[in-house]
UniProtKB/Swiss-Prot annotation:
The mammalian APC/C is composed at least of 14 distinct subunits ANAPC1, ANAPC2, CDC27/APC3, ANAPC4, ANAPC5, CDC16/APC6, ANAPC7, CDC23/APC8, ANAPC10, ANAPC11, CDC26/APC12, ANAPC13, ANAPC15 and ANAPC16 that assemble into a complex of at least 19 chains with a combined molecular mass of around 1.2 MDa; APC/C interacts with FZR1 and FBXO5. It is found in: Nucleus; Cytoplasm, Cytoskeleton, Spindle. InterPro entries: Apc5, Apc5_dom, Apc5_N, TPR-like_helical_dom_sf. This is Anaphase-promoting complex subunit 5. Pathway: Protein modification; protein ubiquitination. It comes from Mus musculus (Mouse). Keywords: Cell cycle, Cell division, Cytoplasm, Cytoskeleton, Mitosis, Nucleus, Phosphoprotein, Repeat, TPR repeat, Ubl conjugation pathway. GO terms for cellular component: anaphase-promoting complex; cytoplasm; nucleus; spindle. Belongs to the APC5 family. TPR repeats lie at residues 194-234, 235-285, 286-322, 323-363, 364-403, 404-451, 452-485, 486-525, 526-565, 566-605, 606-645, 646-681, 682-721. The modification Phosphothreonine is found at T217.
Length: 740
């Protein structure tokens, strides 16, 4: 049988076969042995030795590309190889026969050129053995394929030379020796040998895990896998890589199909490595059910996942497989984590994992416990102590992936508690770390979910501080590192949409913000509904906004999403006082404050106090409002977003002006001067985030204060700024005092 110039008989009996490309590699090895040591420098020989391994392990490539790779290492040898192949291809069949007869001489003599047990020696012996098993008709077909391979290579070389003459400025990009397999390389090759297939699969699996951008596209990879499976349907590893590839495109049917085929083939090929056949069979069955449960859970099919998990537990109990049962226990927690008693299950899972010596599962359990306790309002020091214990496990067992997850989780916890400086430090720590995993297959970066989460936090933190250019650079890096079709792309898509939404709202472009709500809702339904209510509120559609917020509040309370519950309560309170009902807003704000204190959400608590102070200002008690502000303003100025800093300083100015109404003239003038300084600081904060609507409000207040102090020139300057912004921005008929 012959396919694409590859002569092979029984695919399951022969681990390697002869192809035109491998003949070219044999010519290279032969020329390296014939060339004297003086003809090739030590540096060139070192480069050639480094080149050999990817040439022997990788898939077949075109002859022109092979010439280029050899020429980069040793131009003289590339010319010799080209001449030798040309003489063989343009000669007769006996030239190829003689070439293979001469290969055996490499092992002869007291000091042979090649040792039989070396990598090159094993390759030569495999090729000689495979060639000797060919019939005469197969040898003739191989020689015909070699001629065609040479002609295609010569044609490509001429075309490249013409292109170089037409455009001398374009330089050929140098290929690294360990680059990932390119699509054009794979497409030119025939069916891979067993070693080539194993190398290809391990390379693509490593790329899918760590650097998906360098892996083949889903369609191209699936095409190659189908080609592999066509010649060897029982290749279990190919089925598993097909399963991973289908997960990239969210194809639940094909991924399930490939996963089941993988475990079927494990049983057929005896890959379980068990002396007892029944034990290996049962192991495949229970782990197949467990992986099927994980797959259904990934796609949100929780009922099917629970049924598959029950099947895995039943088989594992029959076989007394404690390791499998521990995995099942972990997935039971994932499926039932919304239940009130789920933490008991998780604690039991961690204890059992430690007992059976499963550090990976134990660490995952600890991190899940930390996440659950963070949402339950436990103190940060206890959570960090627990993460420190899990980090000891990571470093002890070199669990690189879990180290990354731990640091990313610390970043998220610090942001949850409103400590942006600590979150920024943790995110940068993760990005500057080197992975403990060996870098192979050209993987130079760790493109895991942890890195995507850390980069998204970094972009949002920069955007909060008004550094939109820096946030844009981070997002650009995210888009390059995680393309839109990759599995973690939704993280940066949501982050990008939220930043654009906030900028549009700050700039008063509510129609643009409204158009972004659809994209946010597609990625995160709760966040999208909340943002829709914010837009409606900004457009003075109070009735619609109130209905939406009430529905969202009920839903989030049911889900126990405390952070969103507090945000919704703050929006409801703002809606009340903008509707001239500040007394109704007070109980809502007190409820939000109680939740913030209970769950130790410091930043949300400070923001709630800020809103309480504003409500008291509206109710005519500015002195009490100032007292509250002194409690809340320090965390906001230390860790808050620039917009919140501006709002806080603006509110301080309003309270100072309102409190000065009963002062004597001298003290009142001092209070107004202090208020003007605070207004200038607030204006600087608003300018950083390009919030022109609030700058307009500040300019209005400054003009009024300067007028009260008799400073005509400063008043006119502020009035001019106010007028310019008032003409540019739409007026919604909301009194300035009712806008925090």
């Amino acid at each position: 049988m012959m396919t694409n110039g590859v002569v092979h008989a029984n695919l399951f009996g022969i681990k390697d076969w002869v192809t035109p490309y491998k003949i070219a590699v044999l010519v290279l090895l032969n020329e390296m042995g014939r060339t004297g040591e003086g003809a090739v420098s030590l540096v060139e020989r070192r480069k050639l030795n480094q080149l050999l391994l990817p040439l022997l392990q990788g898939p077949d490539i075109t002859l022109s590309k092979l010439y280029k790779l050899i020429e980069e290492s040793c131009p003289q040898l590339a010319n010799s190889v080209q001449i030798r192949i040309k003489l063989m291809a343009e000669g007769e069949l006996k030239d190829m026969e003689q070439f293979f007869d001469d290969l055996s001489d490499s092992f002869s003599g007291t000091e042979p050129e090649v040792h039989k047990t070396s990598v090159v020696g094993l390759f030569l012996r495999h090729m000689i053995l495979a060639y000797s098993k060919l019939s005469f008709s197969q040898v003739f077909k191989l020689y015909t394929a070699l001629q065609q391979y040479f002609q295609n290579g010569e044609k490509k070389t001429v075309e490249d030379a013409d292109m170089d003459r037409e455009d001398g400025e374009k330089q050929m990009e140098k290929e690294e020796l360990d680059v990932s397999v390119r699509e054009e390389e794979v497409s030119c090759s025939g069916p891979l040998s067993q070693k080539q297939a194993e190398f290809f699969l391990s390379q693509q699996a490593a790329l899918l895990k760590n650097d998906e951008t360098k892996a083949l596209t889903p369609a191209s990879l699936q095409k190659e896998l189908n080609n592999l499976l066509k010649f060897n349907p029982d290749f279990a590893e190919a089925h598993y890589l097909s399963y991973l590839n289908n997960l990239r495109v969210q194809d639940v049917f094909s991924s399930t199909h490939s996963l089941l085929h993988y475990f079927d083939r494990l049983i057929l090929t005896g890959a379980e490595g068990k002396s007892n056949g029944e034990e290996g069979y049962g192991r495949s069955l229970r782990y197949a059910a467990l992986n099927l449960a994980a797959l259904h859970c990934r796609f949100g099919h929780y009922q099917q996942a629970e049924l598959a998990l029950q099947e895995a537990i039943r088989i594992a109990q029959e076989s007394n497989d404690h390791v499998c049962l521990q995995h099942c226990l972990s997935w039971l927690y994932v499926l039932g984590q919304k239940r009130a008693d789920s933490y008991v299950l998780l604690e039991h899972s961690v204890k059992k994992a430690v007992h059976f010596g499963l550090p990976y599962l134990a660490s995952l359990g600890i991190q899940s416990l930390v996440q659950q306790r963070a949402f339950a309002g436990k103190t940060a020091n206890k959570l960090m102590d627990a993460l420190k214990d899990s980090d000891l496990l990571h470093w002890k067992h070199s669990l690189s992936e879990l180290i990354d997850i731990s640091i990313a989780q610390k970043t998220a916890i610090w942001r949850l508690y409103g400590r942006s400086t600590m979150a920024l430090q943790q995110a940068q720590m993760l990005l500057s770390m080197n992975s403990l995993e060996s870098l192979n297959a050209g993987v130079q970066q760790n493109n895991t979910e942890s890195f995507a989460v850390a980069l998204c936090h970094l972009a949002e933190l920069h955007a909060e501080q008004g550094c939109f250019a820096a946030a844009g650079e981070v997002l650009k890096h995210l888009k390059d590192r995680f393309p839109p079709n990759s599995q973690h792309a939704q993280l940066w898509m949501l982050c990008d949409q939220k930043i654009q939404f906030d900028r549009a709202m700050n700039d008063g472009k509510f129609h643009l913000a409204d158009s972004l709500v659809t994209g946010i809702t597609a990625l995160n339904g709760i966040e999208g509904v909340y943002r829709k209510a914010v837009v409606l509120q900004a457009q003075n559609q109070m009735t619609e906004a109130h209905k939406l917020l009430q529905k969202l509040l009920t839903y989030c309370q049911k889900l126990k999403n405390t952070e969103m519950v507090i945000s919704v309560l703050l929006s409801v309170a703002e809606l009340y006082w903008r509707s001239s009902s500040p007394t109704i807003a007070m109980p809502v704000l007190l409820e939000a404050l109680a939740l913030s204190k209970e769950y130790r959400l410091q930043y949300l608590a400070s923001e709630t106090v800020l809103n309480l102070a504003y409500a008291q200002l509206i109710l005519g008690i500015p002195e009490q409002a100032l007292t509250l502000l002194h409690m809340a303003i320090e965390p906001i100025l230390a860790d808050g977003a620039v917009l919140d800093k501006g709002r806080a300083m603006f509110l301080v100015s309003k309270c100072q002006v309102a409190s000065a109404a009963s002062y004597d003239p001298v003290k009142k003038a001092e209070a107004l001067e202090a208020a003007i300084q605070n207004l200038s600081e607030a204006k600087n904060y608003f300018a950083q985030v390009d919030c022109r609507e609030r700058i307009r409000d500040v300019a209005y207040f400054q003009a009024r204060l300067y007028h009260a102090l008799g400073k005509t020139q400063e008043r006119n300057h502020c009035a001019m700024i106010f007028r310019q912004l008032h003409q540019e921005l739409p007026a919604h008929g909301v009194p300035l005092i009712n806008h925090l």
